[in-house]
């Protein structure tokens, strides 16, 4: 940081994440966007105008930005398969890193980043926003002392029609399909909320391409270390967004439900089948930039860590392998 305590952030990519989270850094009193790397000239200029970045700090190559600018942190908001190289480059330059999900689309890459960060004083936060959502925080607290043993989770979206011509349906950039995109948030939500360690995965997928790389629908069965199971369903070929997660233990359940991207509702169910709706103040939710800056200042773990993201990549990669082979796939995180 500068002497004034301002975090100098360089943006890599100015798509949705780059502009939204970049805007959070721009608006925060303790951070500023000082440089931008974007291959699209029009988007680069638009972002520069929005964030008041001078021409001499605009780049079409992120490596040139890292070499040429005095930065404290980078925001990686590029297509999924590019994350690994850009994250590693940022760490090599001694920077803190905010990376959109997923952390990586290769399990060995995710392991490498996790090992690297956990042995350093650099902060890496992954953009899984459920970790900041009071509904999911409430559910996670419910299972701190009694782990769930039966989980169901599903999310639907008009993903295929919406992104048919976008990088998200190009597996060379996305790493896969619906499961690696919107589905990644669902997997992260159930893994983080439950606190369980996955051990094996079985999956069946419907692919939208002849090469069987871009899934439009997936059914994923997960086994956990404590014997619990999860049944996860994602569909990107339906008309709207709905999300439902149900986690059961011997005392009852927690249900998290919502539509589109509005705040989620959490409901607790006791052993007598009585529903309770705990008070959840969504106004207290901090944004991603705020959480990232706080973690750096306090030298504390960010809300969504590299190890959290490693679990998601492990389950996701196992699901694709299982869908292609028809076999259960064991998961090894280390």
Identify the meaning behind each predicted range:
Residues 1-3, 42, 64, 73-75, ...:
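C-terminal helix-rich "cap/oligomerization" subdomain common to oxidoreductases
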Residues 1-52:
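N-terminal Rossmann-like dinucleotide-binding module
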Residues 1-9, 16-19, 30, 106, ...:
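Haloarchaeal acidic low-complexity proteome signature biased toward cell-envelope/secretome components but also
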Residues 21, 57-116:
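Beta-loop-alpha module in the N-terminal Rossmann-like domain of NAD(P)-dependent dehydrogenases
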Residues 60, 98-99, 124-126, 256:
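Hydrophobic residues in well-ordered beta-strands that form the structural core
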Residues 115-123, 134-150, 222-224, 249:
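Basic phosphate/pyrophosphate-binding loop/patch that engages nucleotide-derived ligands
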Residues 130-210, 326:
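Predominantly a Rossmann-like dinucleotide-binding segment in NAD(P)-dependent oxidoreductases
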Residues 213-215, 225-287:
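NAD(P)-dinucleotide binding in Rossmann-like oxidoreductases
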